[in-house]
Amino acid sequence: MNPTVYLSCLVVFSLFYLGKAQAENDDEFATEKQRLLRVYGDSSVDEATRYRNVDDLVKFYDKYSTLLPLKPDLTQRAQDLVRRYKEESARVVLVDGAPAQGGFWLPLVKLLIVQLGVEIASEGFKRAIES
């Protein structure tokens, strides 16, 4: 096969593959964003559900923080809380694969993250209504 044709096919295939991967990431971002907005933006969702989704919210923020148009003060608070949450999670002692009972700081940090998630969701709804 002619090297020029081969390279052209390789470039076209690479661009197609990269475009498909980007589209999948965009779909994943949009799907997870909508799910978390429903959890933290809907006042009918109970606190237990919000607490169960803290890990997902932290992972989402870690992965997509650059794509979220947050105000600088919210961005700073989110970064601080995520950092503290990770530090406290790393300190958790597991007994037979489950966290030991007790502890004060991790539930407090989770509470702050839930409150921040609700605040970010309401900010997102405000921006959606304004535009």
Curated annotation (Swiss-Prot):
Keyword Secreted (UniProt): yes
Signal peptide extent: 1-23
Main location: secreted
Compartmental location: Secreted
InterPro entries named in the record: Turandot
GO CC, any one term: extracellular space
Single GO BP term: defense response to Gram-positive bacterium
Keyword field: Immunity, Innate immunity, Secreted, Signal
Keyword Secreted listed: yes
Pfam families for this protein: Turandot
Family assignment from sequence similarity: Belongs to the Turandot family.
Entry function: A humoral factor that may play a role in stress tolerance. Requires Mekk1 expression in the fat body to regulate response to septic injury and consequent immune response.
Stated name of the protein: Protein Turandot M
